[in-house]
Amino acid sequence: MTWRDAAIDHAKLMAPNESCGLLIDVAGDTVYCACRNLADDTDHFIIHPGDWAKAEDEADIIAIVHSHPDQSPDPSAMDRQFCERSQLPWHIVNPADGSWGKCIPLIGRQWVWAISDCWTLVRDWYALHGLLLPDWD
């Protein structure tokens, strides 16, 4: 089972609440660690500190994963802000249709033409501040 399959299964189990988890690097393999969500409402997540510590003890944490059970997996403004704070990539899944979104911190990105290039950096910086710019055609 891939980490994406594990994250989707966890998201389906937790719906209608958001699921949350961590990706860790175990000897070069990416592994999904399901975490408990401490948020009081269905539209947010707070990773249980004990789950974070356990994952951190097992291996390096390389990303955060959570679900948007009833909406697009595109990162919200809050997702973008907390992605920056965490300095980790965020993967977002909609368990209903299996679609994925991603948010990458502005600092430390690997440059990839048309995926994570200069325009993407500028566009994502503006999105972090509430101004959505279109992708170039």
Language-model-detected regions and their locations in the chain:
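Residue-level signal for functionally critical sites in structured catalytic/ligand-binding pockets
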Residues: 16-21, 66, 117-121, 126
